[in-house]
Regions:
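N-terminal phosphate-binding or glycine-rich loops at protein starts, especially the Walker A/P-loop
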Residues: 1-18
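Accessory alpha-helical/coil subdomains and C-terminal extensions
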Residues: 4, 60, 71-73, 79-94, ...
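Short gly/pro/ser/thr-enriched loop/turn and capping motifs at secondary-structure boundaries
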Residues: 11-14, 77-78, 103-108, 176-179
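Glycine-rich oxoanion-binding loops at beta->alpha junctions
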Residues: 15-67, 76-77, 104, 114-124, ...
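A short acidic, often aromatic-flanked loop/helix-cap motif at beta-alpha or helix-coil junctions
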Residues: 46-49, 176-180, 272-275
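Charged helix-capping and loop-helix junction motifs
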Residues: 55, 185-190, 279-284
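Glycine-rich, charge-decorated loop segments at or immediately adjacent to ligand/cofactor-binding or catalytic sites
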Residues: 105-113, 275-277
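C-terminal active-site/capping subdomain that shapes the small-molecule cofactor and substrate pocket
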Residues: 258-286
Length: 286
């Protein structure tokens, strides 16, 4: 049979002369397959072209007679795996590569009706929180503004909002490639608040995908007063700011301007839904 070598710290280990590894046998795998998170410690490291020529640990592959590279992750992980396979082929050491599309964002190009690994579990756990928030809104007569992870896609926010019958869901895809502005987002939520009031309902909840932030122009970000730092891949580090608090503050300001007395509260659906125990769908996925 095959020997399975687990590599800690993601791609960092392949560009390190002394990678941290663990041999994974069947009894070990049987004890971790139904757990949340990752047994192998992860890393956000994405190698530059110069890293391949200067730091790539080809000896690790040849010494261990590695024939198959299995990667688990999103688009950055997949593209790097492809670069590694091509690099090794150029070095006369071709390998096979299998990529497991794992991301709660559900933003990889898979066959229709096939979500990414982990998405359904994150959606399920997010919906548990969102349902409780909606009950609180009805009980207290308040509004809640939720922000959900999703980087550049709105699938998670939409899935959670749809499951909980939220009166307003804001995702980047709904703007149909027109310019996304803070004013548009705020006005969508305000319109839902007004509509509910006309219906005799003084409470509600809106969920906004963090993906809308990626679509905001630099000018819009400056006008809003939002300050982002960026990771090594050039992505805004959205996890370092509370999107729910930002939007809630803007919505409260607009409500005050138009004379509507509505209390709203922010709720961030973030890292706490990433490493939840997988539901049955994901347990049978892979």
């Amino acid at each position: 049979g095959y020997r399975v070598i687990g590599l800690h710290e993601g791609y960092t280990g392949l560009f390190n002369p002394s990678p941290r590894t663990v041999d994974i046998d069947y009894p070990m795998a049987d004890g971790i397959f139904n757990q949340g998170g990752s047994f192998l410690q992860m890393s956000r490291f994405k190698p530059k072209d110069s890293d391949f020529e200067n730091n790539f640990n080809l000896k690790f592959f040849t010494d261990n007679n590695i024939k198959l590279l299995v990667t688990v992750g999103g688009d950055d992980t997949a593209s790097t795996a492809n670069r590694i396979a091509k690099f090794l082929e150029a070095k006369k050491y071709p390998i096979a590569n299998i990529h497991v599309p794992k991301t709660i964002d559900n933003d990889l190009p898979l066959p229709k009706g096939t979500p990414t690994f982990g998405y359904e579990s994150a959606k399920d756990k997010g919906a548990v929180i969102a349902r409780a928030v909606y009950v609180d809104a009805r009980t207290s007569g308040n509004w809640f503004v939720l922000a959900a992870m999703g980087r550049s896609a709105g699938h998670l926010a939409f899935g959670i909002g749809e499951a909980c019958h939220y009166p307003m869901i804001v995702i980047p895809e709904m703007f149909d490639k027109t310019e996304i502005t803070v004013e548009k987002i705020v006005n969508l939520v305000i319109s839902s608040i007004i509509k509910r009031k006309i219906m005799g309902m003084d409470y509600g909840a809106a969920v906004i995908s963090e993906g809308v932030f990626h679509a905001l122009s630099d000018e819009e970000i400056r006008k809003s007063g939002i300050h982002f730092t960026y990771d090594e891949h050039g992505h805004p580090e959205l996890g370092k700011v509370s999107k729910a608090h930002i939007f809630n503050e803007m919505i409260e300001k607009k409500l005050k301007e138009i004379g509507l007395k509505v209390k709203s509260r922010p709720v961030e659906l973030g890292y706490e839904i990433r490493c939840q125990t997988p539901i049955a769908y994901d347990l049978t996925y892979c």
